Amino acid sequence: MPSERVAKILEELKALSLLEASELVKAIEETFGVSAAAPAGGMVMAAPVAAAAAAPAAAPEPVEEQTAFDVILEAVPADKKIAILKVVRELTGLGLKDAKDLVEAAPKPVKEGVAKEEANDIKKKLEEAGATVKIK
């Protein structure tokens, strides 16, 4: 059973819109110097999914242009794996093992919640190294 303080924070998180949840993740990353782009990826999506589920219950919001994009590593040719691995390490700051796990587990998100321009730059770098990349 969570403490009263934790329960209150949890209730506030449930009320966040998807955009607010994205802003929260960015603020946490900057404040604590961590990255939400985990190699496993499962827990990263838990908060936005919960926020998305809670959002329809709220009043409809005006349609906004997408401002946060996910860069997905779709495919890695075997002969280009080392070059792609180097680019992934450069872009994400991951260690060798984590970057290798990410590259070998394609399709996987390389970066999540980035601006359109940054997403396009990341896509270009990965494609130049030989990867197949998609932006969502």
UniProtKB/Swiss-Prot annotation:
Function: Forms part of the ribosomal stalk which helps the ribosome interact with GTP-bound translation factors. Is thus essential for accurate translation.
Protein name: Large ribosomal subunit protein bL12
UniProt key word Metal-binding: no
Pfam families in UniProt: Ribosomal_L12 (PF00542), Ribosomal_L12_N (PF16320)
Family under the similarity heading: Belongs to the bacterial ribosomal protein bL12 family.
Gene Ontology MF terms: mRNA binding; structural constituent of ribosome
UniProt keyword Chaperone present: no
CDD domains: Ribosomal_L7_L12
Lineage of origin: Bacteria, Bacillati, Cyanobacteriota, Cyanophyceae, Synechococcales
GO cellular component: cytosolic large ribosomal subunit
